[in-house]
């Protein structure tokens, strides 16, 4: 997920290639990060008949106008005569919370439309493009000038709406894991102390990430040691987030109203996950509380640990489409071990903590042969102050 930024929008009339316009459309799409779920992030750029930049737009919030509408809403028929529209995702053909973008565009005096990805819904895939063709507008799938560039852009186009694509194809929650460690991979002292490993710049970016996912998940250890608020504190974002807590044995539910998060969040926005075998005991504990979070009773595996696949399946049913896991070492490694993490955000600070008195976030993951090592695919890197971050897909 890209950082919120002040994009360098070209001056009107600036010549742009289709590749450059698509790259700008991708960057534009990320502006909607905190507000569009469960819809995909989409960006759109309009070029005039001579290939000069005219305007850009993005899908700003769920239920609001789509990127194509925002890109053309302030343009006249003369501005759009012979224009070329570049958009990251095929214009929608169906009527939903908003009218069909394809039908809207078909009424404009455009010459051409280029879209980055075909609509993933097989029932409507290609229909948006066909509506435009029937109106006499060229509509084609984006292809970069050379093979390497095309592969790179294809990856970027998939990444910009990766949670949406995962939801549609798999009907599962898209899971991202955020970790912060020292150079030697330590995430906390053995006492549990971990504040702070990374700097203020990294932590601000994490609050941006919190806003971009439907929920924030932590384990009970994080609650016990840090008593965190788990809210979003970012200078550019005002948003109430949802929190998921894994407390398999229900140890902390009786103290819920004493926790900071109970004051920071409406009870309906907190989801407390406990073993289904303990349902009766947990319900007894919650009767004594003045307010109660939403309870999620989860199947257990051999050994008593919660079945994380069942947990995610229940969260999907409850409306979650993406989740940022920020839990401690045990929570993080548990999700990685069972192959449930789609994307990793790994922040590292230029410090060394040493393994003798610290904990690694992978200490429960055991790999016997190098051929079984875990790969981070399509990694990208960013710096935040003195820290750096690597992010990529885990396969």
Locations of regions flagged by a protein language model:
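Conserved histidine-centered catalytic loops in small-molecule metabolism enzymes
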Residues: 277-278, 363-395
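Zn2+-dependent cytidine deaminase-like catalytic core
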Residues: 46-153, 242, 276, 302, ...
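Short beta-strand scaffold segments in enzyme catalytic cores
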Residues: 41-51, 179-180, 390
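Flexible, gly/pro- and Lys/Arg-enriched active-site loops
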Residues: 337-376
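Residue-level signal for inorganic ion chemistry
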Residues: 25, 43, 92, 132, ...
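Short gly/pro/ser/thr-enriched loop/turn and capping motifs at secondary-structure boundaries
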Residues: 120-123, 224, 251-253, 279-280, ...
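Short, basic/aromatic recognition patches
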Residues: 17-37, 167
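Active-site ligand-binding patch in enzyme domains
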Residues: 166, 170-318, 330-333
């Amino acid at each position: 997920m890209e950082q919120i930024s002040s994009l360098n929008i070209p001056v009107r009339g600036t010549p742009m290639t289709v590749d450059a316009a698509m790259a700008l459309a991708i960057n534009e799409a990320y502006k909607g990060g905190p507000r569009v779920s469960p819809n995909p992030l989409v960006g759109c750029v309009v070029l005039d008949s001579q290939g000069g930049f005219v305007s850009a737009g993005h899908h700003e919030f769920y239920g609001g106008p789509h990127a194509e509408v925002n890109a053309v809403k302030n343009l006249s028929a003369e501005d759009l005569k012979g224009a070329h529209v570049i958009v990251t995702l095929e214009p929608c053909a169906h009527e939903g919370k908003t009218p069909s973008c394809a039908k809207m565009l078909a009424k404009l005096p455009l010459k051409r439309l280029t879209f980055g990805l075909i609509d993933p819904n097989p029932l409507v895939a290609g229909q948006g493009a066909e509506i435009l063709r029937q109106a006499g507008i060229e509509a084609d799938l984006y292809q970069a000038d050379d093979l390497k560039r095309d592969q790179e852009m294809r990856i970027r186009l998939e990444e910009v709406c990766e949670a949406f694509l995962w939801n549609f194809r798999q009907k599962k929650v898209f899971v991202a894991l955020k970790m912060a460690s020292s150079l030697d991979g330590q995430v906390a002292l053995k006492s549990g102390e971990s504040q702070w490993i990374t700097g203020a710049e990294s932590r601000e970016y994490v609050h941006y990430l919190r806003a971009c996912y439907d929920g924030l998940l932590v384990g009970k250890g994080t609650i016990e040691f840090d008593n965190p608020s788990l809210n979003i504190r970012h200078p550019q974002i005002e948003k109430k987030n949802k929190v998921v807590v894994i407390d398999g044995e229900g140890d902390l539910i009786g103290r819920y109203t004493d926790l900071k998060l109970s004051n920071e969040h409406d009870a309906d926005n907190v989801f407390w996950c406990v073993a289904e075998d303990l349902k009766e005991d947990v319900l007894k504990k919650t009767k004594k509380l003045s307010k109660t979070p939403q309870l999620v009773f989860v199947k257990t595996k051999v050994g008593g640990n919660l079945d994380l696949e069942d947990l995610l399946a229940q969260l999907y049913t409850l409306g979650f489409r993406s989740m940022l896991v920020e839990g401690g070492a045990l929570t993080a490694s548990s999700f990685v071990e069972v192959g449930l993490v789609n994307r990793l955000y790994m922040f590292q600070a230029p410090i060394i903590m040493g393994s003798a008195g610290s904990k690694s976030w992978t200490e429960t993951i055991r790999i016997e042969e190098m051929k079984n090592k875990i790969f981070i695919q399509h990694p990208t890197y960013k710096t935040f102050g003195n820290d750096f971050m690597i992010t990529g897909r885990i396969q």
